From Swiss-Prot:
Protein name: Eukaryotic translation initiation factor 3 subunit M
Family: Belongs to the eIF-3 subunit M family.
Swiss-Prot/TrEMBL keywords: Cytoplasm, Initiation factor, Protein biosynthesis
Residues annotated as domain PCI: 180-354
Assembly with partners or alone: Component of the eukaryotic translation initiation factor 3 (eIF-3) complex.
A single GO molecular function term of this UniProt record: translation initiation factor activity
Source species: Yarrowia lipolytica (strain CLIB 122 / E 150) (Yeast)
Function statement: Component of the eukaryotic translation initiation factor 3 (eIF-3) complex, which is involved in protein synthesis of a specialized repertoire of mRNAs and, together with other initiation factors, stimulates binding of mRNA and methionyl-tRNAi to the 40S ribosome. The eIF-3 complex specifically targets and initiates translation of a subset of mRNAs involved in cell proliferation.
GO CC, any one term: eukaryotic 48S preinitiation complex
InterPro entries (alphabetical): COPS7/eIF3m, eIF3m, PCI_dom
UniProt cross-references to HAMAP family, sorted A to Z: eIF3m (MF_03012)
A Pfam short name: PCI
Xref: PROSITE patterns: PCI
Subcellular location: Cytoplasm
């Protein structure tokens, strides 16, 4: 689950139990070692694991130097168990702010050690195929890391595609899945990975097993707020988002208005019908309008190889002296490439990415371009075929 290394302990179960229980007794438990050895002698291994499980909270009294190694030893002892009933007891004993070991120099150091132990537990459980325990362990690690300022320890895993795979494939309760998605999303935002966070929501909403109405609304809200999202195509293509047309009409209308770059409509919504929606969702009306203008400019550039400043100003409803700034913003958003000419008062378009839903007219334009491309290819093939036939005829003539 993380890049943290963990100690591998070797030896027979009897030796490992003797070492672990002897240490636990020093923390305040009498006769644990003797009771466990008697159970082992009687062939009652489950009894041994039960006895150790009952004393797990004592391990949090370990010194900073011994805490992680003794927990790793404990996990190794449990690896001899045929069941995984002990997992919940481990999570209960080590998780939560109140269970942080007090021997460490502050919560950050203690949290780092706890996350390391939970990472080892997660790796152990990866072969058990118990999705619920894996999810609960990951939740515990995320909670501890967040509370103690150690999210960076899990950054590598959280940023990987494997995290999305877990969420989409684990057979777990819906409320647990929602908690997990919320925790991972929050962690990615705190790790300054807004694009990854949004991709997580897109994947979750796009999966019928994980999609929920609140999550769909959150996806739309975060996409509209994001400084990095200008192409809403993948979001609008999701069926749960399309369903908002009937279940959350105002939010859906706001989404499609911004995504299509409809500046006049956005101005109208911000001043009227959607004013309360914008306030309720903590949207910034000016930011939404700015995003709409950037998308509008990209769509305008996709329709013409060169655009006069006056046309840009009219379509974006901005002053002529700010046109170049809007073009620069659109270039920075990755939607267009081109060259500004102050002399000609125009923008020469080299590349433009049209945003928003694909309308019937867009498909017709695409179809026309494909027809032209197809005709050009056929013309080239005809020329090549004719040249080949002429070459073969010339060879036959020479041979004769």
């Amino acid at each position: 689950m993380s890049d943290i290394n963990f100690m591998v302990v070797d030896g027979s179960l009897a030796d490992l139990v003797a070492e672990l229980t002897a240490y636990i007794e020093t923390l305040g438990c009498d006769e644990l070692e003797a009771n466990c050895q008697r159970a082992l002698a009687a062939g009652e291994e489950p009894k041994v694991f039960e006895l150790i499980t009952q004393q797990l909270p004592l391990l949090n009294k370990s010194s900073e130097q011994q805490f992680e190694s003794v927990w790793q030893l404990c996990l190794h002892v449990f690896s001899f168990s045929e069941s995984f009933e002990w997992v919940d007891a481990v999570l209960k004993a080590i998780s939560g702010h109140s269970n942080l070991p007090r021997s460490f120099n502050g919560p950050a150091a203690a949290g780092q050690a706890v996350v390391a132990v939970l990472a080892s537990l997660f790796n152990m459980l990866s072969s058990s195929h118990d999705d619920a325990q894996l999810a609960n362990t990951l939740l515990a690690a995320l909670t501890t890391a967040e509370e103690t300022g150690n999210l960076h320890l899990l950054a590598g895993q959280l940023k990987s595609d494997q995290t999305v795979t877990w969420i989409n494939t684990w057979q777990i309760e819906a409320d647990v899945r929602d908690q997990l998605i919320a925790k991972i999303y929050s962690a990615l935002v705190q790790l300054d990975e807004p694009a990854k966070a949004l991709a997580l929501l897109v994947a979750a909403v796009g999966n019928t097993q994980t999609s929920t109405f609140p999550m769909t609304c959150k996806l739309v809200q975060q996409a509209l707020k994001s400084d990095h999202v200008y192409d809403f195509g993948s979001i609008l293509a999701l069926e749960p988002v399309e369903d908002l047309k009937t279940t959350e009409q105002r939010l859906f209308e706001l989404l499609t208005t911004v995504a299509s770059g409809e500046v006049a409509k956005m101005q109208s919504l911000a001043a009227g019908d959607a004013k309360s929606l914008i306030e309720e969702n903590d949207f910034d009306a000016e930011s939404l309008l700015a995003k709409t203008r950037v998308i509008a400019l990209a769509n305008l550039a996709a329709e013409s190889p060169e655009i006069e400043y006056s046309i840009i100003a009219k379509n974006l409803d901005v002053s002529l002296d700010t046109v170049e700034l809007w073009v620069i913003d659109t270039i920075r958003a990755g939607l267009v490439e081109g060259r500004l000419s102050q002399t000609k008062q125009s923008f020469a378009v080299h590349r433009a990415q049209k945003s928003g839903p694909i309308a019937k007219a867009d498909w017709e334009v695409i179809s026309q371009k494909l027809d032209v491309w197809k005709k050009s290819i056929n013309d080239v093939l005809h020329v090549v075929k004719q040249a080949r036939e002429n070459a073969n005829a010339q060879k036959r003539k020479i041979a004769a």
